[in-house]
A protein has these predicted regions:
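C-terminal binding/interaction regions
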Residues: 249-257, 264-265, 278, 300, ...
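Short, structured beta-strand/loop micro-motifs enriched in basic residues and often containing a Trp
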Residues: 312-322
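Short, charged beta-turn/beta-strand-edge "cap" motif at the junction between a beta-strand
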Residues: 335, 341-345
Length: 510
């Protein structure tokens, strides 16, 4: 009988969550490096470079890779011969206590993103609890833990289908994935759960994302099972879609496809697909009664020495003097360096502004959006001499429902976020001669270094969703939708899907 100390378990959860906040799994970094060297689309290559540079900076500075430090998901396999030294806390409560300590760590506070009463008040719980815990009793005398912090951008793109037994899973994935947009921050991974029931398939898909990146080894070895054959087929065909890094078009959309399957009813084919983003964060550890998990940090020399050059065609913009006429010359796809003051705002702030305008109250005191830019972001709290913590973009698509209101009623000139905008929003941007700029998702610590001043100007009660004023210097962004409605998230993938088909045809002709 192995005795596991409650305190060792809690401490291990805390240490693991701190660890994954600033360390990518090395297998994922190696896969990204391969994708970087392989990439032919310069925009996608630049995006991967920023992700890799950000990853090394986070590893060095012990600060979060992404401002969205995620919802904690924990798989706990407890051996039947394990005994706990105390029984006053359940496993759920122990995981929550470790989560609480990790997210409130004063040296590296992580962003609290969990809201209670999700269908009602949606009030932040302040410590990122509760976590999501899956518990399994297994043979043995130790405890095995797989833990991840999953950001909302990728989690929100989860897709579920109850297919007919004769339906093609490949066809469903290839039809579904392009409709998911770029809010899941590719390049990443796909976890696919097949079989069981609907909820079992979802758990299988999530658990698959905890597995190591090994598609290249599988390609070299060759498929031996139906699941392995499906992995290889999907890996090849998904990347031929040309979605690319950040949805800009390119050769690599996924670095691996993971599949877990179990038997199912003869009448059913449940399938769930969950993407993991470029800020993939997970860790696997064991407890055997000898103490807390021994989590060894990776070596910094394991990170690639990638550089990112802006080039000579970059456009420098002063946000404090910009006029509507200025943005008319900006073209979709070009790189812009922003300097000056911008405001921030995301879901809760937009909803509150909409309610105020609908009541005829006007904007909150201190907020003037006329000819200004708004950055969709919820930053991590600052520590030590930081102006602000990691502050990467959130998914812009969620603000689509508010865009016409913001452009027509506030005089807003531009927006900054990640991922694509919907067709109606693009039309609204075109109508108002506004612009939408894209920052790289998964490069939050890198982006934060461009922010020189920060202050809360409205809705302080919303915490990370408050409206801030940032003063930035040379913040890198890409024109994603210009004032004429040209849209890189439509153009890029279409071009690169055709380019990949052409390259494929040439290879087959040889």
């Amino acid at each position: 009988m192995t005795v596991i100390r409650q305190q060792d378990f809690i401490e291990s959860i805390e240490d693991a969550l701190q660890y994954i906040s600033y360390y990518h799994p090395l297998d994922f970094i190696q896969a990204l490096e391969q994708a970087y060297h392989k990439e032919q689309n310069q925009a996608a290559k630049d995006a991967i470079a920023q992700i890799l540079i950000n990853s090394r900076m986070s590893a060095e500075g012990h600060r979060p890779i992404c401002q969205d430090t995620g919802i904690v998901t924990c798989f706990v396999k407890i051996g039947m011969d394990v005994k706990w030294d105390k029984t006053d806390l359940t496993v759920q409560q122990m995981v929550d206590e470790g989560t609480r300590r990790a997210y409130l760590n004063p040296d590296n506070p992580l962003r609290a993103s969990i809201v209670a009463d999700p269908a009602g008040a949606r009030k932040n719980t302040k410590d990122n609890t509760p976590s999501v815990v899956h518990i399994d009793l297994v043979a043995g005398h130790h405890v095995e833990v797989m833990i991840a912090a999953k950001g909302g951008g990728s989690e929100n793109k989860t897709k579920m289908a109850m297919l007919n037994p004769s339906d093609s899973i490949v066809d469903w994935v290839l039809e579904t994935l392009p409709k998911m947009g770029a809010g899941w921050c590719p390049p990443g991974m796909l976890g696919i759960g097949i079989g069981g029931t609907a909820e079992k398939a979802a758990v299988l898909a999530k658990e698959a994302l905890m597995e190591p990146v090994d598609i290249q080894e599988l390609i070299a070895k060759g498929a031996e099972t139906a699941d392995e054959k499906l992995r290889l087929e999907l890996y090849e065909k998904v990347n031929k879609l040309g979605i690319g890094a950040q949805g800009l078009g390119g050769l690599t959309t996924v670095v691996d496809v993971k599949i877990n399957s179990v038997p199912t009813h003869a009448a059913s084919l449940p399938v769930v697909m969950i993407p993991n983003c470029a800020a993939t964060r997970h860790l696997h550890f064991h407890l055997d009664g000898s103490g807390p998990a021994d989590i060894k940090p990776p070596k910094l020399e394991d990170w690639p020495q990638v550089t990112w050059e802006l080039g000579s065609k970059v456009r420098r913009v002063n946000l404090d003097t910009i006029t509507p006429a200025d943005v008319q010359s900006w073209q979709a796809g070009e790189t812009v360096l922003l300097s000056g003051k911008m405001l921030t705002g995301r879901d809760a702030a937009h909803k509150r502004i909409a309610d105020m305008l609908n009541k005829g109250e006007g904007l909150p005191e201190g907020v003037d959006l006329k000819n200004r830019f708004i950055y969709y972001v919820g930053p991590v709290d600052a520590v030590r001499d930081e102006v602000v913590g990691p502050a990467g973009p959130t998914t812009a698509t969620r603000m689509d429902k508010f865009t016409e209101m913001m452009l027509s009623q506030t005089g807003l000139l531009g927006m900054i976020g990640k991922s694509e905008r919907g067709d109606l929003t693009v039309e609204s941007i075109k109508k108002h001669k506004a612009v939408y700029l894209m920052a790289v998702g998964g490069a939050a610590y890198l982006v934060s270094k461009a922010i020189k001043k920060s202050r809360v100007v409205a809705f302080a009660d919303l915490g990370m969703e408050a409206i801030y004023e940032f003063e930035v210097e040379d913040m890198p962004v890409t024109v994603a939708v210009d004032s004429n409605g040209n849209n890189v998230h439509k153009q890029g993938p279409a071009i690169w899907k055709a380019n990949i088909a052409e390259l494929d045809a040439k290879l087959k002709a040889k």
